[in-house]
């Protein structure tokens, strides 16, 4: 353990220390104040004779007389299966009044590198109970599928609903949720804690809560602690783990804040140039590994600044992940929950997780037909604004009515409503029956004969 009393500068959350011996990147540091108080930190830059240290608890109270001890190790996460049912802080400390975690192992939070050749193709359907996701943008086990939202939209409610309801239908294999909230207010933290406890979802979950007034460096660490926990449960205890993060925008803002404090050359809109690589380090920890029974599925949630989908955060996230679920402000204004706009939404792995033996044989065709009919109905709304409804043909009126009914019955559902995939597909058929059968050009006749409401009643 190396100890120095050579603090040369204090700038915001950073401490600069002159060194004489080599110091490791991301090495842990203890700063002992003159009154004996100990603060923790981490090495951010050790390339020069002056080491940059990010102080977790902030630099107030630190002076040139404070001593800096380099501990010779990086952050390790104490993990145990007993973490299920626990609520932890962004640094892994208990928030629920329970005892400290007695670790079975202490793991590096950066995670083990996964050989790309050893990854298995995702193929198992995860039912979230939300029709717009299950029916139109299916989540597959091992996938990373982000939710793009905006400020003031109910993405936290959607996150909680997915955490409560997500399951692999027909599977008896153990399923767990790791919920990671970053940069949230104390009020939001209370809401999350109460909801998990009220619904009983906490029994199969590990919850990490990083608050808005916690240090920026902790916000960088929190998702890595969550993913390390998920990897331990998945690959050591053969569990299928769903990791939900909210809000990745707060994480990226912390990256920008730390980059500015280090006086790095900024990239697009002031974010560090390595943000793509940093996000990939998190998202690429999802997947299924050959020879392991467990899996990790990720649902990162982010708020798009100014609802701009071309902003660097959603833009880079879209390059790394396998699709996106888009939460729309216009649907929210109509008081529709969840306000998920299926038109720009996409699940790139959907075709691998649906069909006979997984969901139902007609799933792909019904989804395609709903997309097509809804798009046509939305286009007709623009035409109605110009020429009026009376100028429409009977066929056009049917598509217009379908678009309204689709939003009101298929997209809209209760916050506690858990629809099975059969209920979702049957509801889609009920809505498609509003259209003439000859307009269902995306669906094979054998499925129309089997599932169309007018045929089933005979």
Curated annotation (Swiss-Prot):
Gene3D superfamilies associated with the record? 3.40.50.12240
Question: Record keywords: Nucleotide-binding included?
Answer: no
Q: What Pfam families does the annotation carry? A: ATP-synt_ab (PF00006), ATP-synt_ab_N (PF02874), ATP-synt_VA_C (PF22919)
Keywords of the record: ATP synthesis, Cell membrane, Hydrogen ion transport, Ion transport, Membrane, Transport
InterPro entries linked to this entry:
ATP-synt_VA_C, ATPase_a/bsu_AS, ATPase_A1-cplx_bsu, ATPase_F1/V1/A1_a/bsu_N, ATPase_F1/V1/A1_a/bsu_nucl-bd, P-loop_NTPase, V-ATPase_su_B/beta
Q: Indicate where this protein resides in the cell.
A: Cell membrane
Set out the biological process GO terms recorded for this chain's protein: proton motive force-driven plasma membrane ATP synthesis
Q: Which SUPFAM superfamilies match?
A: C-terminal domain of alpha and beta subunits of F1 ATP synthase, P-loop containing nucleoside triphosphate hydrolases
- GO cellular component terms given for this protein: plasma membrane; proton-transporting two-sector ATPase complex, catalytic domain
What are the protein's GO molecular function terms? ATP binding; proton-transporting ATP synthase activity, rotational mechanism
> What membrane topology is annotated for this entry?
Peripheral membrane protein
**What family is this protein classified in?**
Belongs to the ATPase alpha/beta chains family.
Q: What does this protein do?
A: Component of the A-type ATP synthase that produces ATP from ADP in the presence of a proton gradient across the membrane. The B chain is a regulatory subunit.
Note the subunit structure. Has multiple subunits with at least A(3), B(3), C, D, E, F, H, I and proteolipid K(x).
Which protein, by its recorded name, is this? Answer: A-type ATP synthase subunit B
Native organism = Methanocella arvoryzae (strain DSM 22066 / NBRC 105507 / MRE50)
